[in-house]
C-alpha cells in the first residue's frame, strides 16, 4: 500500500525544510506501541511521545481503525455544516470538562490565540478599550505573535519584536503579585496560566493546586476570566482528564 521510498538521513546534504528546529540526525519510519523504528529496523523506546501528543502509543489498533474508517466515510465539509462526529466529540469534551461549549482548533497555539481573543472581546463588551491579561513568568503558550507575547520566555521572543501589548507578567504561583496587579491595573480582564508549566521546566506552584483555587476566587471577585492552558497537561496526561 505504501510505495514511497524513504532515503536515509544525510546530514551533509542541504534540506528544503526551514532550519527552525534543532533536529537530531536520526529518522524514524514507523512506530508500534511505545517504540519507534528507523529504516534499518533499529528500535528505540519513545519517551518523548511527539512532545506529549502520542501518549496512547504508535499505531494503536483502535485509533488506526477509527481514523481509517472516518477517512473512508467523510473527511471534511467545513464548519458551515453540521458534522455529527464533531457534535458528539464536543458533547464528550464538555462533559469531562464540566463546561458547556467547545471550540475545535488545529493546534495549541491556535487554541491559546482564541483564548486571548475571547478575553479581549470580553473586555471590549465591558467598555474596556485596552484590556490586559495577567500571565506568568517562565510560561509557554505558543509561537504565534499573541501567544509568543504572552509567553514568559525571552529566549523564544528574541528577534520577533515588537511584541503584542496587553500582558502583565507575574511570578508563577505568586498570589500577592496578582492582587498587586489588580490594584494598579483596573483594565485587567483575565488571568491566563498553565496549571503545571511544561516548557518552563515542569513547574508546579509552591502551594500546589490551591493556587488555582485562589486564582478562581480572585477572578470571581474582579469579574475576570480564568483561562487555563492545558495543551501539555490536558487529555489525561497527569492522571486526571483536565
Regions found by a protein language model. Give the residues of each.
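Conserved N-terminal phosphate-binding loop of PLP-dependent enzymes in the Aspartate aminotransferase
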Residues: 2-242
Amino acid at each position: 500500500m505504501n510505495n514511497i521510498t524513504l532515503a536515509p538521513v544525510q546530514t551533509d546534504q542541504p534540506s528544503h525544510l526551514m532550519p527552525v528546529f534543532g533536529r537530531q540526525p536520526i529518522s524514524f519510519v514507523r512506530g508500534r506501541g511505545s517504540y519507534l523504528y528507523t529504516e534499518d529496523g533499529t528500535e528505540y523506546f519513545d519517551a518523548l511521545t511527539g512532545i506529549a501528543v502520542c501518549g496512547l502509543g504508535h499505531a494503536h489498533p483502535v485509533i488506526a481503525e477509527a481514523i481509517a474508517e472516518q477517512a473512508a466515510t467523510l473527511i471534511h465539509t467545513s464548519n458551515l455544516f453540521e458534522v455529527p462526529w464533531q457534535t458528539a466529540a464536543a458533547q464528550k469534551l464538555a462533559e469531562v470538562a464540566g463546561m458547556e461549549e467547545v471550540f475545535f482548533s488545529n493546534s495549541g497555539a491556535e487554541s491559546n490565540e482564541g483564548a486571548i481573543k475571547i478575553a479581549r472581546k470580553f473586555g471590549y463588551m465591558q467598555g474596556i478599550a485596552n484590556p490586559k491579561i495577567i500571565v506568568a513568568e517562565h510560561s509557554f503558550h505558543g509561537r504565534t505573535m499573541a501567544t509568543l507575547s504572552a509567553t514568559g520566555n525571552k529566549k523564544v521572543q528574541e528577534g520577533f519584536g515588537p511584541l503584542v501589548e496587553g500582558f502583565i507578567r507575574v511570578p508563577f504561583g505568586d498570589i500577592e503579585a496578582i492582587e498587586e496587579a489588580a490594584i494598579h491595573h483596573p483594565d485587567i480582564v483575565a488571568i491566563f496560566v498553565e496549571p503545571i508549566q511544561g516548557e518552563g521546566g515542569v513547574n508546579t506552584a509552591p502551594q500546589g493546586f490551591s493556587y488555582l483555587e485562589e486564582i478562581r476566587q480572585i477572578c470571581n471577585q474582579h469579574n475576570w476570566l480564568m483561562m487555563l492552558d492545558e495543551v501539555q497537561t490536558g487529555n489525561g496526561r497527569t492522571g486526571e482528564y483536565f
